[in-house]
């Protein structure tokens, strides 16, 4: 018999949407997180500014909520976190709505896996359409890539094929956002 911990672990390891840039664009460090240690572990930390502009973390800056790192997370290998025992507080605390639904017995694990697979397929479709439109930056969160591509295409003249691909992208991104907001992350309470 599987324990609730092993079921949760299986779901999280199957998913990874909170680490791979699909749900979040960045992760803000919390009080108590050691920026210095996380940087040594390979996270590309930046200072968060009020304007959302960021700069590299200077030596000597060690902790606090002023730091963040971009998604997709550089410690995520596609299946699991490579710094799991020392991951930031926000990562330790986050549980998506789908996982909570399984833990409460409202969703069967098999149903959760199907939902994850659907979301991953939809994210893959968005990535493919972004590539077709010239955006190959796999190190940037999906939402940021979509905004960057949208802005670029809206500012210039585009041919009919590009317009058709962009309309497909817009619909695919909308469908992905629906799945994410309904099943994974309805937003801050």
Q: In which residue ranges do the predicted regions lie?
A:
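Hydrophobic scaffolds flanking metal-cofactor catalytic centers in soluble metalloenzymes
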Residues: 1-189
